[in-house]
């Protein structure tokens, strides 16, 4: 049975997480003047368009991407559905948060080519472990040579089965409360179930990241019959009301929710 990793106190862990987000604002992920109250003012203060020169400047002055990670990102973008991959700025923020809380164990739901798994693995110590879940065996094999090139393959534990099965197996094996970070970027129909199980597997002070929580803007008014959009909208409301976590929903990529377990 896997032993729980040493736990930071909840206030300390949350303070660290807050510090990381503050650093992200300070170093350029969020530009412009001090953000106004969310109601009643028209001042624009968040992100420039991703195809703008200002956005490219932002990335060029903030990104520190491992060569193998960059190669894997470019390779992934060439694949069908490659644009659904975690963005480089999301990956770097999550990796920095993992370093900040001295993470050793991570969950990654939705491997694809393993870009997010590799980003996390590179942030963990030599004895760290990333359990990553995928149902299609082909995409991870595209990324495996680059996991090896980055000398991080030994940290990546690929589970080729439905993510819910892997999560239930981890819980049955007594690993509840032993993971430091969890990233959810899998099918949206099961996103609420993923959230609940990941929260059980996280230790207090652990970080749960949910990607694509804006679902191309469809969460505002899910189209009739769009089950995925409805599920994402419901999860957003669920997390907003969840007293077990502190949250931030960030406008990075297609939306990134960070939930810090209390």
Swiss-Prot record:
Pfam family, one: Methyltransf_3
Keywords: Membrane, Methyltransferase, S-adenosyl-L-methionine, Signal-anchor, Transferase, Transmembrane, Transmembrane helix
One of the GO BP terms on file: methylation
Subcellular locations according to the entry: Membrane
Membrane topology according to the record: Single-pass type II membrane protein
InterPro entries: Cation-dep_OMT (IPR050362), SAM-dependent_MTases_sf (IPR029063), SAM_O-MeTrfase (IPR002935)
Broadest EC class assigned to this enzyme: transferase
The UniProt record lists the keyword Transferase: yes
Main location, first listed in the record: membrane
Enzyme Commission code: 2.1.1.-
Transmembrane segments: 12-32
Quaternary data: Homodimer.
Similarity field: Belongs to the class I-like SAM-binding methyltransferase superfamily. Cation-dependent O-methyltransferase family.
The protein's name: Catechol O-methyltransferase domain-containing protein 1
Lineage, uppermost ranks: Eukaryota, Metazoa, Chordata, Craniata, Vertebrata
């Amino acid at each position: 049975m896997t032993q729980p990793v040493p736990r930071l106190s909840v206030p300390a862990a949350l303070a660290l997480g807050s510090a990381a987000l503050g650093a992200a604002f300070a170093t350029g992920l969020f530009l412009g003047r001090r953000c106004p109250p969310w109601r009643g003012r028209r001042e624009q203060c968040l992100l420039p368009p991703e195809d703008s020169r200002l956005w490219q400047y932002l990335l060029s002055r903030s990104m520190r991407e491992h060569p193998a990670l960059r190669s894997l990102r470019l390779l992934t973008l060439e694949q069908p559905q490659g644009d659904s991959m975690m963005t480089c700025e999301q990956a770097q923020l999550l990796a920095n948060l993992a370093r900040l809380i001295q993470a050793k164990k991570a969950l990654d739901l939705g491997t694809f080519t393993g870009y997010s798994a590799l980003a996390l693995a590179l942030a963990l110590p030599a004895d760290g472990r990333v359990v990553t879940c995928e149902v299609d065996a082909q995409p991870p094999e595209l990324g495996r040579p680059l996991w090896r090139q980055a000398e991080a393959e030994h940290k990546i534990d690929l589970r080729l089965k439905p993510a819910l099965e892997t999560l239930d197996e981890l819980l049955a094996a007594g690993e509840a409360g032993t993971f430091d970070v969890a990233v959810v970027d899998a099918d949206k129909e099961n996103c609420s179930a993923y959230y609940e199980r990941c929260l059980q597997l996280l230790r207090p002070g652990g970080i749960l990241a949910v990607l694509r929580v804006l679902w191309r803007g469809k969460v505002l008014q899910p189209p009739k019959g769009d089950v995925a959009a409805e599920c994402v909208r419901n999860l957003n409301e669920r997390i907003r009301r969840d007293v077990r976590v502190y949250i931030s929903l960030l406008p990075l990529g297609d939306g990134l929710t960070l939930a810090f377990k209390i």
